[in-house]
């Protein structure tokens, strides 16, 4: 932006800022760590100290996930510096404090960008998108990494500022990150590439629509196949897990309006997939999951689904 200002460049621009934090290792700045009572803990043999300023445990915290997710031994679950395999209160609260400190630093850096845009008179003519590629567990459901399809990992922040967008407005519709390209092209008034698979959500940004996607499909197959799949429609969400040998085979059904943190039986909330009252909804969501797997050419099937000659 400084170079653009110096050369008096007026050509439309796109700048991408990629921050590694709050991905681990979450080594925050001392002054920001102090704000959250956290330390850059390096002692693998012992947990960090508890501090009153550390964030509280998440509502869906567990000391251990209740079953094998099909990739429980992945690096993010056993080797993250500062936590490793511990899920005790002190380790989790300290690590969330480190996450917050790293996120605060990103806020500071974005503030520098906004200030420069304001100084050059381009702030009100620039679309700014703040998002991430995935969330992170850090103690939620007894997990640490991103290898799962719970909301704390599958859902990402998405904030947009720019011309024609009502400040402070909020919508709860579904989008994929692949929709960003189509949206930017739409906002710029240019044709999307032929290879684009996304859908523009410009009408959502301008208030003309509330949703562009009724259904979201999620997949994680980095471990034992077929792995994990999820489908979400409205308030309802289904997650299915299965390993190739059948040793891990689980189904979860959530109503996110009633259970936004996806609390489990271990939290005192029943799994709706096991509740006869929700048998019809379970079948409906399972059918929707299969339909999405077929529509998107998913090469795997669960044992309770048709093989489709794959």
Question: Where do the PLM segments sit?
Answer:
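Carboxylate-dense, calcium-coordinating segments in secreted/extracellular and ER-lumen proteins
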Residues: 262-270
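C-terminal, non-catalytic tails of nucleotide-sugar-dependent glycosyltransferases
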Residues: 52-53, 59-62, 288-299
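Hydrophobic side chains within alpha-helical segments
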Residues: 110-112, 182, 289
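Segments surrounding the PLD/"HKD" phosphodiesterase catalytic module and close analogs
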Residues: 201, 271-273
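Residues that form generic nucleotide/phosphate-binding pockets
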Residues: 35, 204, 275, 288, ...
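C-terminal cap/loop subdomain of S1 sulfatases and analogous C-terminal strand-loop tails that border
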Residues: 5, 134-140, 176-181, 186-261, ...
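Active-site-proximal cap/lid insertion segments
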Residues: 1-178, 187-195, 242-247, 269, ...
